[in-house]
């Protein structure tokens, strides 16, 4: 019985957040058995805009595509990069909810005019203005989410994101850990990531703002990867053989980039098991999402009724998964090296 108490104590101490001795105000949501029994190395974490918005809620550009385009447009106007008529045209398109990918593409082209063989870098300036000083804008509950992601990463999970920001990399650096940002322009590194040779790398499938030339909004922008059969085979094997865990993603599976990379080759697979954590919110919308995702092998799981429920839920899930993964690893090690290895500390689940 003593070991059970010790395990519970370890789990409660996992990251140091929400460990003030206060009893929980409501009964925590149960963890789905088929998810909590996964090991970190069996997971690919997919980070969507919902995570970035939770980490730095005061930055409108992190909340949605529309928010990002508006922020870029505002920066372009502030820097006198657009004529009045041009800015009005872009504002009108945003207001009318025109195709946002096309609007973003046109704005990027406008901010990156090519003269002879030289392309200006005004787009880069606008990006840096939009994402300026993200470190100071992170909130504690958001940092807890990033800490959970980083913990799973260090224990073998792969991470990809649809976001342009580098919040996870910034948080890791603050913890004294170095993560690499990858985009689809570097086929060699993408291949190595898919082969699990670059586990401490974050794959940004739309690019990352620190490398504007790697930003792509449509599959046409990374034909080099789509035409590389070796890279595509390794990428799609991940979706077939691992469990993707979607965090803050909503309708990410409708993203044309994500579909081209992962879904095209596995449309008719029936043995996929992926997971999506979402807020329950509107019951009808939740049911609709759950039904739609099941067709793609994705189980939609509610972490609670409020966005604020996610950090604590994901912390518990992370510790459960890490504990099982670490225990299995130490059991194997113990068989080889004697029983003492099996009694080592589970890193991250104790102080």
UniProtKB/Swiss-Prot annotation:
Modification N-acetylalanine occurs at: 2
UniProt modified residues of type Phosphoserine: 9
Chain segments carrying region Disordered: 1-32, 330-351
Localization terms from the record: Nucleus, Cajal body
Annotated positions of the N6-acetyllysine modification: 11
Transcription listed as a keyword: no
UniProt main location, coarse: nucleus
Family named by the database record: Belongs to the FAM118 family.
Protein name: Protein FAM118B
Organism: Mus musculus
Taxonomic path: Eukaryota, Metazoa, Chordata, Craniata, Vertebrata
